[in-house]
A protein has these predicted regions:
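Helical hairpin unit composed of two closely spaced alpha helices linked by a short loop
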Residues: 337-339, 347-369, 373, 378
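N-terminal localization/anchoring segments of enzymes in phospholipid and broader phosphate metabolism
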Residues: 1-328, 332, 336, 360, ...
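Cytochrome P450 I-helix active-site segment
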Residues: 205, 367, 371-378, 385-386, ...
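Thr-Gly-centered strand-to-loop micro-motif
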Residues: 343-345, 402, 421-422
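Catalytic-core elements of nucleic-acid end-processing and repair enzymes
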Residues: 410
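Histidine/acidic-residue-rich catalytic or RNA/ligand-binding cores of hydrolases
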Residues: 353-355, 382-384, 414
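A general structural signal for well-ordered alpha-helical packing
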Residues: 327, 334, 355, 368, ...
Length: 490
């Protein structure tokens, strides 16, 4: 026993004696071998220097970078999709696309970027319904689920085993018994409150489930910092949903802490459904270890919308990609704005590029409106958000807090012509660390509808004025600065 003790003691002594060496080694890894923002690099270096052991543990849990080649093997979906992309690129380069539709006039460069960076097809035959109330959204979703005939694909960051999912679960089990293929993809971190035995039970009932980034042990998650934040539903390739609502009772106003949950979700019919289907299947293949691309029938049955058509691209981003496509879309839209920018986000922690672009827009005479929640669901990001909002207030932007519950809506409208809504928050986590998906819609009617919704929300908002922000207490200022200082660690 004494020999074992001596071996352990020798190992501890060796580690402590070489702590500086290990710190230097990890510093080299962070600086030279990982693609990071310089602020993030310095934050991690300081943490490793001042808190060597705990800093190392935090780095293992939160700081590891991801590389596309290591984490995903993204395949071509079908030859004709690739062919269509090349044809669209040719038409954009030759400017023939201007013959197609006035709705993208002036945004050809953005359409081209989405094609090049993420193979996001521009589709033109889409219907869109906008939901801002959880009860209405889930009523429509459950009706569509009941009408499913071939397959149901569901992906949410958070699914809670409560009254809402109990209703959905009963429909899924019933449809599976009828021979409909049902797949549910969930994030390990977001669904950590649900026991694995519950998912196993659903599998036994015919509902296929898959966990994205499962923990090694129940409480040990080494990829905690990388979360699949996407919320996608695709049914028979006829209808799809994407937006901010997760699955839990708070999203249908049954949680006293938050009260009314204000979010935005899109119901889509048309060719854009295929973009969401491909996105779901890419994630499913990785999590479940399958290759659903060998099932060509899962990519058929796309039907055009039946009402007012709109142009749309489905874009996605994540730590597996070399470009931050959603971030770059927001940045390009801000820079192209000529009259107005409307932003709703629960978390406003932009990087320097987005922040500077918004400030330049304000100083150029463009009306910039930003709406955030009046209450926190995560205190850290809440106070960091207020710090960055303060910069925008002092620059002259119109900034508001939503006071009728919790604001979880995520998106931007520019010049009443283009809107970009989906799962991505206006923060560095969504841009660089989370797996996200948004819809870019080039349509004045839908854009104006979203502006009208924003204006309606202002009736229950409070404007953050310069006088109000300057007069905040010292305690609040300290909270803001500490949280802002730590935000690059994300």
């Amino acid at each position: 026993m004494s020999e074992v003790f001596e071996i352990v003691k020798t190992g501890i002594d060796f580690f402590c004696n070489h702590l500086v060496f290990f710190n230097m080694l990890f510093a080299i890894v962070i600086v030279f071998f990982q693609r990071r923002d310089p602020k993030s690099v310095w934050a991690w270096l300081l943490l490793l220097y001042f808190i060597p052991v705990l800093g190392f543990v935090f780095y293992l849990l939160l700081g590891q970078d991801m590389h596309k080649r290591k984490m995903f093997r993204i395949k071509e979906v079908e030859d004709h999709i690739s062919k269509d992309i090349r044809q669209q690129e040719y038409r954009l380069r030759s400017r023939d696309v201007q013959e197609m539709d006035d709705s993208i006039r002036g945004y050809e460069d953005l359409v081209m970027y989405n094609l090049e960076a993420g193979e996001a097809m521009l589709t033109k035959d889409n219907d869109v319904d906008i939901f801002i109330d959880g009860n209405e959204k889930f009523r429509a979703l459950m009706e569509d689920l009941r009408n499913a005939e071939q397959f149901i694909h569901i992906q949410y960051y958070i699914i809670k085993n409560d009254v809402l999912f109990n209703q959905i679960k009963d429909i899924l089990i019933e449809k599976a018994a009828q021979g409909v293929e049902v797949r549910v993809l969930f994030d390990a971190m977001g669904c950590r409150s649900v026991r694995h035995s519950y998912w196993k039970w659903l599998n036994e009932k015919g509902v296929q489930t898959a966990e994205f980034f499962p923990a090694i042990l129940r409480r040990l998650q080494l990829r905690i910092n990388y979360r699949n934040h996407r919320k996608i539903v695709v049914i028979d390739n006829k209808v799809a949903y994407v937006g901010g609502f997760n699955v839990g009772k708070e999203y249908i106003d049954l949680d006293e802490k938050f009260g009314h949950w204000r979010d935005t979700h899109l119901r889509i019919c048309g060719s854009a459904v295929l973009g969401l289907q491909v996105r779901f299947i890419l994630d499913w293949n990785y999590a479940a270890g399958e290759n659903l691309f060998l099932r060509p029938e899962l990519f058929r049955g796309i039907e055009a919308g039946t009402r007012d058509f709109c142009d749309m691209q489905i874009i996605s981003s994540g730590p597996d990609k070399t470009t931050q496509q959603i971030h770059d879309n927001y940045l390009r839209l801000i820079n192209k704005a000529q009259k107005s920018i409307y932003i709703q986000t629960p978390y406003f922690i932009p990087d320097e590029a987005i922040l500077n672009a918004l400030m330049i827009a304000v100083k150029s005479g463009i009306e910039v409106n930003i709406m955030i929640p009046c209450m926190p669901d995560h205190p850290f990001v809440y106070w960091a958000t207020y710090s960055y909002i303060g910069d925008m207030v002092m620059a002259g932007a119109n900034c508001y807090t939503y006071n009728n519950g919790f604001l979880h809506s995520k998106g931007m409208i520019v010049d009443g012509k283009v809107l970009c809504y989906g799962t991505a928050n206006m923060d560095i986590r969504s841009f660089a660390l989370n797996f996200e998906v948004n819809a870019v819609i080039y349509d004045e009617k839908r854009a104006q509808e979203m502006v009208d919704i924003f204006q309606k929300d202002l009736e229950v908002c409070r404007q953050i004025t310069r006088d109000y922000y300057v007069a905040r207490r010292l305690k609040i200022r300290i909270k803001e600065q500490i949280c802002r200082l730590l935000s690059p660690l994300l």
